[in-house]
Amino acid sequence: MKLSATTLTAASLIGYSTIVSALPYAADIDTGCTTTAHGSHQHKRAVAVTYVYETVTVDKNGQTVTPTSTEASSTVASTTTLISESSVTKSSSKVASSSESTEQIATTSSSAQTTLTSSETSTSESSVPISTSGSASTSSAASSATGSIYGDLADFSGPYEKFEDGTIPCGQFPSGQGVIPISWLDEGGWSGVENTDTSTGGSCKEGSYCSYACQPGMSKTQWPSDQPSDGRSIGGLLCKDGYLYRSNTDTDYLCEWGVDAAYVVSELSNDVAICRTDYPGTENMVIPTYVQAGDSLPLTVVDQDTYYTWQGLKTSAQYYVNNAGISVEDACVWGSSSSGVGNWAPLNFGAGSSDGVAYLSLIPNPNNGNALNFNVKIVAADDSSTVNGECIYENGSFSGGSDGCTVSVTAGKAKFVLYN
């Protein structure tokens, strides 16, 4: 998805921290196709699509903040959902009636480009290891890159080896030190490739920015400070003279740990694919937090005070939560209206931290009104943790109303509990 730089602000939050979350929802797309590269289906550019950012702002106590309030507060956050025009039409009365708790930013895109990967790509003969124990549990996918989707680092430990510019060929995926391959996209392990002609997909080639995923709990560190003026975001390593170079030389490592504030804990008998958007970058929802039955994994909570900003606004980590029992290869892709996966998954997570307070959200996906086949609640991880507010998704309904819910974590950690 490409967002233009023309932004209309319907309301403003003076004195509060406004945070933009990257949640790319599919809209009506011109069916004319220009290219198909390595399993990534590209549609025509210059498609006019209207999107709306719907922002719910809460303070550190998990309470909704009225945008016009004069209350002094230095620690608040906004959970922002990007909604397609068709969804806004259906819910416009609701948005208008809840103006005290939402901020709307209407953005017109003149170059909406979507990369779609069909679920059929999961049927190739190669395999990608997904086992947390490093044993023989595998899932089918196609790629020359190797490595587990759970990474090689212990939680919140490392990385230890610095990345050396100009030493790894563009055709070689740099697995390790937290970097994990996305094998099912058929792009050599990369989570997305942005080319010099503004197209996306294919191999990592000269002049392209080649984006990558990091293991659960981590985020990539690489994106150029000079971003496009048309609202697109660029992220990843730069392919130059046949070799990979950092686009952000302020750090020596390709992955960094987020704030140690949230875990996903499964009480289910089936695995669940939670797919983060690749942002900054193509916004493919392909970065996996694949929680196996009865297991737990850290959920990346980005430090919004130091992480990527979009046109001066802080950004948070955003996730698509798929129904239990769907493989990671079939779930962490661009889906279709009938698939119920990827950008059509029933639920979104949001996670970010500012001024030492973590904000965690459950957010409805307007693309899919069906209930998830399990429930989710955000609760304190232990007695020493402090979680303000209530946030429960049960049988398709939210404790905070139809717009979802947000909690703040002021001490310790929270857990997203998946249960029946």
Curated annotation (Swiss-Prot):
InterPro entries cross-referenced by the UniProt entry? Beta-Glucosidase_SUN, SUN
- Per the record, the gene is SUN4
Major location (coarse): secreted
Q: What induces the gene encoding this protein? A: Expression is decreased during transition to slow growing or stationary phases.
Q: Which PANTHER family match?
A: BETA-GLUCOSIDASE-LIKE PROTEIN NCA3, MITOCHONDRIAL-RELATED (PTHR31316), SECRETED BETA-GLUCOSIDASE SIM1-RELATED (PTHR31316:SF0)
Question: What outcome is recorded for mutants in which this gene has been deleted?
Answer: Leads to increased resistance to zymolyase treatment.
UniProt keywords, alphabetically: Carbohydrate metabolism, Cell cycle, Cell division, Cell wall, Cell wall biogenesis/degradation, Glycoprotein, Glycosidase, Hydrolase, Polysaccharide degradation, Secreted, Septation, Signal
What EC designation does it have? 3.2.1.-
For molecular function, the Gene Ontology terms on record are: glucosidase activity
Q: Organism, per UniProt?
A: Saccharomyces cerevisiae (strain ATCC 204508 / S288c)
Give a short account of its post-translational modification: Glycosylated.
The entry's family comment says: Belongs to the SUN family.
* Segments of this protein annotated with the region Disordered: 89-145
Under the cellular component aspect of Gene Ontology, which terms does the record hold? cell surface; cellular bud scar; extracellular region; fungal-type cell wall
- Pfam families membership: SUN
Where does the signal peptide begin and end? 1-24
The answer to whether UniProt assigns keyword Hydrolase to this entry is: yes
Q: What is this protein called?
A: Probable secreted beta-glucosidase SUN4
Q: Which cysteines are joined by disulfide bonds?
A: none
Record localization: Secreted, Cell wall
Q: Name one GO biological process term.
A: polysaccharide catabolic process
Function recorded in the entry: Involved in the remodeling of the cell wall during the various phases of yeast culture development and under various environmental conditions and plays a role in septation.
So which residues have sugars stuck on them?
A: 395
Answer whether the UniProt record assigns the keyword Thylakoid to this protein: no
Q: What class of enzyme is it?
A: hydrolase
Kindly give any further remark recorded in the entry.
Present with 24700 molecules/cell in log phase SD medium.
